[in-house]
Amino acid sequence: MSKKVRELYEQFPYPLRDPQEEKDRLLMPPMDTLSRVNHYGFAGRKNVDAGFRALVAGGGTGDSMVWLAEQLRDCGGQVTYLEPSQASTQVARARAEARGLVNVTYVNATIGEFAAMAPEKFDYINCAGVLHHLEDPEEGLRDLVSVLADDGCIGAMLYGEHGRLAVTEWRKMVALLLPGKDLNEQLAMTRSLLSSLPEGNMLLKMGGGPGFIKGLLENDPEIVDLLLHPVECAYDVHGVYDFAASAGLDVAAFTGFFGFGGTGKAHYSIENHITDPRILRDLMALPLRDQQAFCERYSAAMPLHAFYLTRPNKVPSVA
């Protein structure tokens, strides 16, 4: 992890969360719902009991950690929260304490540093919105595989290339304005630009309208993570499959991701996009990944990809 990325998350823990709100609500990221993990990652055959071990790799302010720990608290399962940012860890720990969660171990380290510790293997690894911020994402994935149980499952999220085009173009637009400015100055500039966006700007379309920009202007960590991150890359559907293969993994299924539309499993099914029977017949004759790649380009509305990864031939395919 680069020095700039470390500094960003120390200054702006992400996502913005208030531990006091744990008294009133529980955030439940669907990718980390254990019944779903069991279905797609283990064909429904995994016993989620006291021996179940989950790792949240790049836990941020704790959304996935809290939800996994809540699901495992009664059966005795354990969660390891891995995060290099002390500021983010402070928020995450406070959230867990507010809920009385005692089945969490906190580790302040990068993915590579943690893998080098050779910990006991994990049944499920969450790594959402992290690998695409590494200078070598494939190395990061290989490090995760090194701590994954033989029959384990990884739930990952990567930025989507086509649905994120508005952000890509924004980053190109402001690139010449960033040198010489510290992060606070970059943020002030970005807030000024966002406050007077032309009606045709692609960010408005990507976010669904003015309400998206209003929400951004009320959430500095979101602005920084979305528009000012110093290291990021994005993937199309074929890129996701190739990325998985680089670490010897299969894409078991695409799934939904908390807080975003257009990324559920149904959005990768051509039957949900195409009604012309002749076109549908031609598409159905293609390999699955080609069908899914068509859906991504046709919808142009997938800003990210959430998916489960397993080792080849470990899990029978499921619907």
Regions found by a protein language model. Give the residues of each.
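A short acidic, Gly/Pro-enriched loop at the edge of an enzyme's catalytic core
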Residues: 115-125
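Conserved class I S-adenosyl-L-methionine
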Residues: 153-205
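Conserved alpha-helix/loop element of class I SAM-dependent methyltransferases that forms part
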Residues: 11-16, 21-51, 67
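Conserved SAM-binding loop of SAM-dependent methyltransferases across substrates and taxa
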Residues: 61-75
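Rossmann-like AdoMet/SAM-dependent catalytic core
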Residues: 202-319
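A short glycine-rich, Lys/Arg-flanked "PGG" loop and its adjoining helix->strand segment in the class I
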Residues: 138-150
